[in-house]
A protein has these predicted regions:
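Alpha/beta enzyme core
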Residues: 1-101, 107, 114, 118, ...
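Active-site pocket-lining/capping segments in soluble small-molecule metabolic enzymes
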Residues: 101-152
Length: 174
């Protein structure tokens, strides 16, 4: 393991200071928390920039990891995962430097897609669900469609844009 880390660190040093090497250990699940700490501390000794101890199971483990690992720590928060769902502000106050609600948006999007498609399958229409949906204008604003289309006009040849939009103006504002 240390040889691979040294190779990653050499690559980081060759690339420049904006490249971060994060060490991840999943050892808790296999060999336990103490071994995960040992592995993380060994990686820090070699020179990694950040550590991610996957699946911390209690706030006590979180605190202990923060106390014993002398590097910035990442915490991922996954609904239904092993790590307690602590508010981001609490995780920051504890000392975590990189906090990732890794699947929250994906889980919410999947639930929303499932619910609306189930409604359409059962009733044939999304009516009655519209208050949970973006309007096209809201969607265009959130995904910054006007900016995307401005970049298209700047970087894509006019002929290709005409083919893409069948000679019509973009569809912003629908």
């Amino acid at each position: 393991m240390m040889g691979k880390l040294r190779a990653a660190l050499d690559a980081r040093d060759a690339i420049g200071p904006d490249f971060v090497v994060m060490y991840r250990t999943d050892a808790i699940h296999v060999t336990g928390f103490d071994d995960a700490l040992h592995r993380a501390k060994s990686a820090v000794e070699v020179g990694v920039d950040m550590v991610f101890v996957e699946a911390l199971e209690t706030r006590e483990q979180m605190k202990r990891a923060l106390e014993e690992i002398r590097a910035p720590l990442m915490l991922n928060l996954i609904e239904g995962g092993k790590t307690p769902l602590v508010p981001v502000q609490e995780a920051e106050a504890m000392g975590f430097k990189f906090i990732v609600p890794a699947l929250s948006a994906l889980f919410a999007a999947a639930r929303g897609m499932y619910d609306v498609m189930t409604k359409i399958r059962k009733e044939g229409v999304s009516d009655g669900y519209l208050d949970k949906l973006f309007t096209f204008g809201e969607f265009a604003e959130v995904v910054r469609l006007e900016e995307i289309q401005a970049m298209e006009e700047r970087y894509i040849p006019k002929k290709i844009l005409e083919e893409k939009y069948h000679g019509k103006k973009h569809i912003v504002g629908h």
